[in-house]
Amino acid sequence: MDPYKKAIDIVNRPDTDVSRDPNRKPDEVLRFFQVHEGDKVGEINAGRGYFSACAANVVGEKGKVYAHSSPVSIERWKGNPIEKRLKEFHQSNLYPVVGEMEEPNFPDGLDKIFNIMTYHDAVWSKADREIMNQSVFNTLVSGGIYGILDHNAKDGSGIDNCHDIHRIEKSFVIEEV
């Protein structure tokens, strides 16, 4: 079976995750970013772990996925959402990490690091994106992939819509990174 389809066809997934699949297309995202069995992956601001959990299913027992939560998100969720997820849906290769967006505290030597639907949050939360991006590149292996997926704002808007409608202009992110 296709490893990307297999990642979302696993029975032990929350119904809320399964309901997001048609719009979020995690199998296509993980394929696009070339996540493979045995990879070491990090996700910045992983929220409740939707993409991290799917990535953990692809990397398998030989791989590791580090799902980052910031102190702000832990306060907002009244606890670490990744730890809460793991209590109900255990994945032995999914590890919660805590740190600021600028320095997520990933171990060195990751193959891929994702920022999924949260790059715009780094803008409105006033995170130092230069430090964040440099931290990512310092953590990746040579040739590693920094995958950013976010809602695209209309051309010319830059960062103007990051807080109100949670959009950021694609060309702005490409230039900045």
Regions found by a protein language model. Name each.
Residues A56-N57, D128-S142:
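A short glycine-rich, Lys/Arg-flanked "PGG" loop and its adjoining helix->strand segment in the class I
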Residues W77-P104:
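S-adenosyl-L-methionine
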Residues D2-F32, H36:
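Class I SAM-dependent methyltransferase Rossmann-like catalytic core
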